[in-house]
Amino acid sequence: MNIMAYRNKKLYIILSLIVFSLAVTFIDAFVHPPYFSKIPIKILFFLALPMLFFVIWREEWSEFKSLFRFQKKGLLISLLLGLAIFGVILGGYFALRGVIDFSGVTASLTSGMGITADNFVWVAIYISIMNSFLEEFFFRGFGFITLKKYVNVKFAYFFSPVLFAIYHVGMLVGMFHPAVLALILFGLIVGGLIFNALNDKLGNIYPSWLTHMAANFAINTIGFILFGIL
Protein backbone atom coordinates (compact mmCIF):
# COMPACT_ATOMS: atom_id res chain seq x y z
CA MET A 1 0.00 0.00 0.00
CA ASN A 2 1.18 3.51 -0.82
CA ILE A 3 2.61 4.98 2.40
CA MET A 4 1.11 8.42 1.77
CA ALA A 5 -2.36 6.97 1.09
CA TYR A 6 -2.06 4.80 4.20
CA ARG A 7 -1.22 7.85 6.32
CA ASN A 8 -3.97 9.98 4.77
CA LYS A 9 -6.61 7.33 5.41
CA LYS A 10 -5.58 7.04 9.04
CA LEU A 11 -5.58 10.80 9.55
CA TYR A 12 -8.93 11.23 7.81
CA ILE A 13 -10.68 8.75 10.10
CA ILE A 14 -9.04 10.05 13.29
CA LEU A 15 -9.70 13.71 12.49
CA SER A 16 -13.29 12.96 11.42
CA LEU A 17 -14.08 11.43 14.79
CA ILE A 18 -12.27 14.12 16.79
CA VAL A 19 -13.74 17.11 14.95
CA PHE A 20 -17.28 15.71 14.80
CA SER A 21 -17.35 14.65 18.47
CA LEU A 22 -15.95 17.97 19.72
CA ALA A 23 -18.29 19.95 17.47
CA VAL A 24 -21.38 18.08 18.69
CA THR A 25 -20.48 18.38 22.36
CA PHE A 26 -19.65 22.11 21.96
CA ILE A 27 -22.95 22.80 20.19
CA ASP A 28 -24.93 20.83 22.77
CA ALA A 29 -23.18 22.55 25.68
CA PHE A 30 -23.25 26.16 24.46
CA VAL A 31 -25.69 26.59 21.55
CA HIS A 32 -28.54 24.35 22.78
CA PRO A 33 -30.33 23.85 19.44
CA PRO A 34 -33.79 22.22 19.51
CA TYR A 35 -33.34 18.45 19.28
CA PHE A 36 -35.52 18.03 16.21
CA SER A 37 -33.62 20.67 14.22
CA LYS A 38 -30.34 18.97 15.13
CA ILE A 39 -31.40 15.54 13.82
CA PRO A 40 -30.98 16.17 10.05
CA ILE A 41 -27.61 17.86 10.56
CA LYS A 42 -26.29 14.96 12.64
CA ILE A 43 -27.58 12.44 10.11
CA LEU A 44 -25.82 14.34 7.33
CA PHE A 45 -22.43 14.27 9.06
CA PHE A 46 -22.82 10.74 10.44
CA LEU A 47 -23.18 9.59 6.83
CA ALA A 48 -21.17 12.17 4.87
CA LEU A 49 -17.85 11.87 6.71
CA PRO A 50 -17.54 8.07 6.30
CA MET A 51 -19.03 8.07 2.79
CA LEU A 52 -16.55 10.71 1.62
CA PHE A 53 -13.75 8.44 2.83
CA PHE A 54 -15.05 5.51 0.78
CA VAL A 55 -15.63 7.74 -2.26
CA ILE A 56 -12.10 9.20 -2.14
CA TRP A 57 -10.50 5.79 -1.65
CA ARG A 58 -12.69 3.56 -3.78
CA GLU A 59 -10.47 0.56 -3.16
CA GLU A 60 -11.99 0.52 0.34
CA TRP A 61 -15.54 0.07 -0.99
CA SER A 62 -15.50 -3.63 -0.14
CA GLU A 63 -14.73 -2.61 3.47
CA PHE A 64 -17.81 -0.39 3.45
CA LYS A 65 -20.05 -3.21 2.22
CA SER A 66 -18.64 -5.63 4.78
CA LEU A 67 -19.81 -3.35 7.61
CA PHE A 68 -23.39 -4.20 6.66
CA ARG A 69 -22.93 -7.87 5.72
CA PHE A 70 -25.51 -9.67 7.84
CA GLN A 71 -24.49 -12.83 9.69
CA LYS A 72 -26.56 -14.83 12.15
CA LYS A 73 -23.44 -15.85 14.02
CA GLY A 74 -23.01 -13.87 17.20
CA LEU A 75 -26.49 -12.34 17.19
CA LEU A 76 -27.78 -14.54 20.02
CA ILE A 77 -24.93 -13.41 22.27
CA SER A 78 -25.66 -9.80 21.34
CA LEU A 79 -29.36 -10.21 22.15
CA LEU A 80 -28.64 -11.86 25.49
CA LEU A 81 -26.07 -9.20 26.34
CA GLY A 82 -28.57 -6.53 25.33
CA LEU A 83 -31.19 -7.99 27.67
CA ALA A 84 -28.63 -8.09 30.47
CA ILE A 85 -27.65 -4.46 29.87
CA PHE A 86 -31.33 -3.48 29.76
CA GLY A 87 -31.81 -5.09 33.16
CA VAL A 88 -28.67 -3.55 34.65
CA ILE A 89 -29.54 0.00 33.50
CA LEU A 90 -33.18 -0.19 34.60
CA GLY A 91 -32.28 -1.96 37.83
CA GLY A 92 -29.58 0.61 38.51
CA TYR A 93 -32.09 3.42 38.14
CA PHE A 94 -34.53 1.89 40.62
CA ALA A 95 -31.71 1.13 43.05
CA LEU A 96 -30.19 4.62 42.89
CA ARG A 97 -33.15 6.94 42.39
CA GLY A 98 -33.30 7.52 46.14
CA VAL A 99 -29.63 8.47 46.17
CA ILE A 100 -29.11 10.33 42.88
CA ASP A 101 -31.24 13.35 42.00
CA PHE A 102 -32.71 12.75 38.53
CA SER A 103 -34.93 15.84 38.58
CA GLY A 104 -32.46 17.80 36.48
CA VAL A 105 -32.74 15.37 33.58
CA THR A 106 -36.20 16.33 32.32
CA ALA A 107 -35.63 20.02 33.10
CA SER A 108 -32.40 19.98 31.08
CA LEU A 109 -34.00 18.09 28.19
CA THR A 110 -36.88 20.57 28.04
CA SER A 111 -34.90 23.80 28.45
CA GLY A 112 -31.87 22.74 26.43
CA MET A 113 -33.36 20.68 23.61
CA GLY A 114 -37.10 21.27 23.61
CA ILE A 115 -37.87 17.67 24.57
CA THR A 116 -41.10 17.37 26.56
CA ALA A 117 -43.51 14.66 27.64
CA ASP A 118 -45.58 15.45 24.54
CA ASN A 119 -42.82 14.69 22.02
CA PHE A 120 -40.61 12.30 23.99
CA VAL A 121 -42.12 9.18 22.43
CA TRP A 122 -40.89 10.27 18.98
CA VAL A 123 -37.47 11.16 20.37
CA ALA A 124 -37.28 7.76 22.08
CA ILE A 125 -38.13 5.90 18.87
CA TYR A 126 -35.54 7.84 16.87
CA ILE A 127 -32.81 7.47 19.50
CA SER A 128 -33.43 3.76 20.08
CA ILE A 129 -33.47 2.69 16.43
CA MET A 130 -32.14 5.26 13.98
CA ASN A 131 -29.66 7.22 16.08
CA SER A 132 -28.17 4.05 17.57
CA PHE A 133 -27.62 2.69 14.04
CA LEU A 134 -25.92 5.90 12.88
CA GLU A 135 -23.69 5.98 15.96
CA GLU A 136 -22.69 2.36 15.44
CA PHE A 137 -21.88 2.99 11.78
CA PHE A 138 -19.81 6.07 12.62
CA PHE A 139 -18.06 5.12 15.88
CA ARG A 140 -17.83 1.33 15.62
CA GLY A 141 -17.93 0.69 11.88
CA PHE A 142 -15.94 3.62 10.52
CA GLY A 143 -14.16 4.60 13.75
CA PHE A 144 -13.10 1.11 14.79
CA ILE A 145 -13.45 -1.65 12.18
CA THR A 146 -12.11 0.52 9.35
CA LEU A 147 -9.61 2.44 11.51
CA LYS A 148 -7.92 -0.66 12.95
CA LYS A 149 -6.57 -1.47 9.50
CA TYR A 150 -4.33 1.59 9.80
CA VAL A 151 -3.43 1.85 13.50
CA ASN A 152 -2.43 -0.29 16.45
CA VAL A 153 -5.41 -2.46 17.46
CA LYS A 154 -5.23 -1.32 21.09
CA PHE A 155 -5.37 2.31 19.96
CA ALA A 156 -8.41 1.58 17.79
CA TYR A 157 -10.14 -0.23 20.66
CA PHE A 158 -9.83 2.77 23.00
CA PHE A 159 -9.98 5.67 20.54
CA SER A 160 -13.59 5.39 19.41
CA PRO A 161 -15.02 4.71 22.93
CA VAL A 162 -13.26 7.81 24.30
CA LEU A 163 -14.58 9.94 21.43
CA PHE A 164 -18.01 8.34 21.88
CA ALA A 165 -18.00 9.53 25.50
CA ILE A 166 -16.78 13.03 24.56
CA TYR A 167 -19.54 13.22 21.95
CA HIS A 168 -22.10 12.85 24.79
CA VAL A 169 -20.56 15.36 27.22
CA GLY A 170 -22.35 18.46 25.95
CA MET A 171 -25.75 16.80 26.18
CA LEU A 172 -25.18 15.42 29.69
CA VAL A 173 -23.62 18.50 31.32
CA GLY A 174 -26.15 20.09 33.64
CA MET A 175 -28.23 16.96 34.06
CA PHE A 176 -26.14 15.35 36.79
CA HIS A 177 -23.69 16.06 39.59
CA PRO A 178 -20.11 16.05 38.20
CA ALA A 179 -19.29 12.79 40.00
CA VAL A 180 -22.33 11.09 38.47
CA LEU A 181 -21.45 12.56 35.07
CA ALA A 182 -17.93 11.13 35.35
CA LEU A 183 -19.40 7.72 36.18
CA ILE A 184 -21.73 7.89 33.17
CA LEU A 185 -18.86 8.84 30.85
CA PHE A 186 -16.80 5.96 32.21
CA GLY A 187 -19.77 3.69 31.49
CA LEU A 188 -19.92 4.99 27.91
CA ILE A 189 -16.24 4.17 27.41
CA VAL A 190 -16.71 0.67 28.82
CA GLY A 191 -19.80 0.24 26.66
CA GLY A 192 -17.83 1.34 23.60
CA LEU A 193 -15.13 -1.23 24.37
CA ILE A 194 -17.78 -3.95 24.63
CA PHE A 195 -19.36 -2.85 21.35
CA ASN A 196 -15.96 -2.93 19.64
CA ALA A 197 -15.29 -6.43 20.94
CA LEU A 198 -18.66 -7.66 19.65
CA ASN A 199 -18.04 -6.24 16.18
CA ASP A 200 -14.39 -7.27 16.02
CA LYS A 201 -15.23 -10.94 15.71
CA LEU A 202 -17.71 -10.56 12.84
CA GLY A 203 -16.50 -7.42 11.08
CA ASN A 204 -19.96 -5.82 10.88
CA ILE A 205 -21.97 -3.42 13.05
CA TYR A 206 -25.08 -5.51 13.75
CA PRO A 207 -23.95 -7.08 17.07
CA SER A 208 -23.21 -3.73 18.68
CA TRP A 209 -26.32 -2.16 17.16
CA LEU A 210 -28.59 -4.74 18.79
CA THR A 211 -26.88 -4.26 22.14
CA HIS A 212 -26.92 -0.48 21.76
CA MET A 213 -30.65 -0.55 21.00
CA ALA A 214 -31.30 -2.52 24.18
CA ALA A 215 -29.34 0.02 26.23
CA ASN A 216 -31.28 2.88 24.64
CA PHE A 217 -34.59 1.11 25.27
CA ALA A 218 -33.66 0.98 28.97
CA ILE A 219 -32.56 4.63 29.07
CA ASN A 220 -35.73 5.73 27.27
CA THR A 221 -37.87 3.66 29.62
CA ILE A 222 -36.33 5.68 32.44
CA GLY A 223 -37.13 8.80 30.43
CA PHE A 224 -40.78 7.77 30.20
CA ILE A 225 -40.81 7.33 33.99
CA LEU A 226 -39.15 10.70 34.64
CA PHE A 227 -41.57 12.50 32.32
CA GLY A 228 -44.49 10.81 34.10
CA ILE A 229 -45.59 8.92 30.98
CA LEU A 230 -45.20 5.55 32.74
Locations of the language-model features?
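Alpha-helical transmembrane segments in multi-pass membrane proteins
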Residues: 9-61, 109, 113-114
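Membrane-interface helix/loop boundary segments of multi-pass membrane proteins
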Residues: 134-159, 200-204
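Small-polar-interrupted transmembrane alpha-helices in polytopic inner-membrane proteins
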Residues: 156-169
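Functionally important transmembrane alpha-helices
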Residues: 158, 178-230
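Hydrophobic alpha-helical transmembrane segments
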Residues: 14-15, 75-80, 121-125, 154-159, ...
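Juxtamembrane helix-loop-helix connectors linking adjacent transmembrane helices
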Residues: 36, 63-131, 229-230
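Short, Lys/Arg-rich, polar N-terminal cytosolic tail immediately upstream
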Residues: 1-7
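Juxtamembrane "helix-exit" motif on the non-cytosolic side of transmembrane helices
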Residues: 25-33, 96-99, 169-174
